[in-house]
UniProtKB/Swiss-Prot annotation:
Belongs to the PsaA/PsaB family. This is Photosystem I P700 chlorophyll a apoprotein A2. [4Fe-4S] cluster binds at C563, C572. Phylloquinone binds at W675. One of its GO terms (biological process) is photosynthesis. It comes from Bigelowiella natans (Pedinomonas minutissima).
């Protein structure tokens, strides 16, 4: 058999010589819709993909429901949520030895299982599910919905009769009407209905299903108070603090309340408060969706509304913004991602401070996993918002349409914005690191009393104003003689509007308002440094994307060109891709600090020992030794020469995550000549083995490609490593 020489493609005597390993990188334009589709088809394809996205979400939920109903222990967990570990699914692995089978056979299972840390058990329990039949029925329902949405996506994307016109996509008022009223408003109203008719009765021991749904009143008075205007009747007689969730013991009859705080039995928000919240959201959004002019000649015209916005004698006006937002898809996506990213971070906060799901506050591993998961997701989404905002400025921004409006002035004043952000980053960085390093030196020289410890008195004052009494500020809700405390009645318990608030905020077993000290002060400023630096990089990358002071106009460069040093004319100054690339590292860095802080603080609260955090968090060695190293000890002993335990999979993942993370640096710190030699060596090796021929011409990675590969490895390894550490160190203490 004649071997094909690996040089044949290079020499040009092979008809496939035009093919190179660069072909692998065609996926980089997979989201460049305008290069792939024309005109209205771009909008139609995006619209159709939304149905596919929803179908995937339903399929994911359906799969979880199916696995738990068939392989989980939902019914056993329901009977004792505090002492039963939830099972995600069974494990069938022929590589398991006897000790592995024994270690992973837990939570009452007959064989090896994976435990659930997703909070799904708590969610399903809270919304009224109680049996495996409930789960399997819901699974089938969502599977059918998923198929229907896939069909809808196909019809709207590929069947000419059902493809929407361009006018449909440009009709902003109708889109707002549909999104605000139908998607947000009606779905919130439907969820309120489920909570009132199914979840709240179930939490009080009353089983509601299709056979008695229409014959059982969710409130003793039915709809009479609604039609008579006596709406307060729905909030009278709420559940007591002693109510045992899932039973009638201590249950009330109220369905829409404003108690505030957390249920002391479940550690979660009151279900009747949640129902009230969703009803209010429904009313607000249904009304908001009908404020704009659609089929009738009433309501606001959005363009007139936006362009009528003149501030300071016409400066900073909004003329041209309506047309810009309504025609520029990257700007629309950037705004949507910015909003969703912020909401996702807020969800992470609520997962621990105001948990909506019963008994999730007592499942520490799940709380830690959900908080960390949502913060990382938020970081990626918000960086994506800046990336698409930058692509908008490079490819879609029209200076003539936006002449002298607020967007144009934002670009004109970019030097001031960037310099102020830069100053803030320098201030935060030098001062925060200076304090940490000073404290490290004092500990190293055995004079801890010389540490600089700053009490966060302003933050403590804000907590005290909300009712936190441990600081002895005696201000507003933390003072029993304050008007805020006494109004509207003189009763100490019911004087404030949210009667359950003071009980919850001063309960040190929850995370509602956690006590803070000098360690918190320092790490808050470290996190502020990370946030501002990430923002600086992203904002500068966006504002200088089309051209900077050094290079006035490089719009034709596009978005994805590298920062290649001053030798090529200083493209570092305006490489938007490079700014995004660098910002991802800072985003990961910042979320690392956030999750370290959150986890260490909560380990102390959960274990009833907050002193270690207060004493060790004021200097860097404390973080490295008493948080990272100390909490790694169980993890790295998941398997050793003497055997293994149930943490072994996390130990392996911890090691593997480090490997992926470290591999990233091979791509990030290297010369391109090295890549050319390496890839040619690989192709030569392939050609020596005739069954694995490599037809393409070997071409090294470009700068952008190598950085992209390195960034992906760095990111995946970074997150896998911390995920393993987080779950293993928490479950090792509270299993």
């Amino acid at each position: 058999m004649k071997l094909r020489l690996f040089t044949s493609g290079i020499l040009g005597d092979d008809k496939r010589s035009m093919e190179t390993t660069q072909d692998l990188w065609f996926f980089r334009i997979v989201h460049d819709f305008f290069a792939t589709f024309e005109g209205v088809s771009v909008y139609q394809k995006i619209f159709a993909s939304h149905f596919g996205q929803i179908a995937l979400i339903f399929l994911w939920a359906s799969g979880n429901l199916f696995y738990v109903s068939s392989q989980g222990n939902f019914e056993q967990w329901v009977s004792d949520p505090l002492h039963t570990r939830p099972i995600a699914h069974a494990i069938w692995d022929p590589q398991f030895g006897q000790s592995a089978v024994a270690a992973y056979t837990r939570a009452g299972a007959s064989g090896p299982v994976t435990l659930s840390t997703s909070g799904l058990y708590q969610w399903w329990y809270t919304i009224g599910m109680r049996s495996n039949d409930d789960l399997s029925t819901a699974s089938m329902f969502l599977l059918i919905l998923s198929v229907l949405f896939l069909i809808a996506g196909f019809i709207h994307g590929y069947v000419p009769l059902f493809k929407p016109s361009l006018a449909f996509f440009k009709d902003a008022e109708s889109r707002l009407n549909h999104h605000l009223s139908a998607l947000f408003g009606v779905s919130s109203l439907a969820w309120t209905g489920h909570l009132i008719h199914v979840a709240i009765p179930e939490s009080r021991g009353q089983h509601i299903r299709w056979n008695n749904y229409l014959s059982t009143l969710p409130h003793p008075d039915g709809l009479a108070p609604f039609f008579s205007g006596n709406w307060s009747a729905y909030s009278t007689n709420p559940d007591t603090f002693n109510h045992v969730f899932g039973t009638s013991n201590g249950a009330g009859s109220a369905i829409l309340t404003f108690q505030g705080g957390l249920n002391p039995q479940t550690g979660s928000l009151w279900l009747t408060d949640i129902a009230h919240h969703h009803l209010a959201i429904a009313v607000l959004f249904i009304v908001a969706g009908h404020m704009y002019k659609t089929n009738w000649s009433i309501g606001h015209n959005l363009q007139e509304l936006v362009e009528g916005h003149n501030i300071i004698n016409g400066r900073f006006n909004h003329k041209g913004l309506y047309q810009t937002v309504n025609t520029c898809l990257n700007l629309q996506l950037a705004l949507a991602l910015a909003a969703v990213g912020t909401i996702c971070s807020l969800v992470a906060q609520h997962m621990y401070s105001l948990p909506a799901y019963a008994y999730m506050a007592q499942d520490y591993v799940t709380q830690a996993a959900l908080y960390t998961h949502h913060q990382y997701i938020a970081g990626f989404i918000m960086c994506g918002a800046f990336a698409h905002g930058t692509i908008f400025l490079v490819t879609e921004y029209d200076p003539e349409i936006n002449a002298d409006n607020v967007l144009a002035r934002f670009l004109e004043n970019r030097e001031v914005i960037i310099s102020h952000l830069s100053w803030v980053c320098l201030f935060l960085g030098f001062h925060t690191l200076g304090l940490y390093v000073h404290n490290d030196v004092m500990l190293a020289f055995e004079t801890p009393e010389k540490q600089i410890l700053i009490e966060p008195i302003f933050a403590q004052y804000i907590q005290a104003a909300q009712g936190k009494s441990s600081y002895d500020f005696n201000v507003l809700l933390s003072s029993s003689v304050s008007d805020a405390y006494l109004i509207p009645t003189q009763s100490a318990n019911k004087g404030i509007w949210l009667s359950g608030w003071l009980n919850s905020i001063n309960n040190n077993t929850n995370s509602l308002f956690i006590e803070i000290g000098p360690g918190d002060f320092l790490v808050h400023h470290a996190i502020a440094l990370g946030l501002h630096t990430t923002t600086l990089i992203l904002v500068k990358g966006a504002l200088d994307a089309r051209g900077s002071k050094l290079m006035p106009d490089k719009k034709r460069f596009g978005y994805g060109f590298p920062c290649d040093g001053p030798g090529r004319g200083g493209t570092c100054d305006i490489s938007a891709w490079d700014a995004f690339y660098l910002a991802i590292f800072w985003m990961l860095n910042t979320i690392g600090w956030v999750t370290f802080y959150w986890h260490w603080k909560h380990l102390g609260i959960w274990q009833g020992n907050t002193k270690q955090f207060y004493e060790s968090s004021t200097y860097l060695m404390g973080w490295l030794r008493d948080y990272l190293w100390l909490n790694s000890s169980q993890l790295i002993n998941g398997y050793n020469p003497l055997g293994m335990n149930a943490l072994s999979v996390w130990s392996w993942m911890f090691l593997f995550g480090h490997l992926i993370y470290a591999t990233g640096f091979m791509f990030l710190i290297s010369w391109r000549g090295y890549w050319q030699e390496l890839i040619e060596t690989l192709v030569w090796a392939h050609d020596r083995l005739p069954i694995v021929l490599w037809p393409e011409k070997p071409v090294a990675l470009t700068i952008v490609q190598a950085r992209f590969v390195g960034l992906i490895h760095f990111t995946v390894g970074y997150i896998l490593t911390y995920a393993a550490f987080l779950i293993a160190s928490t479950s090792g203490k509270f299993s």
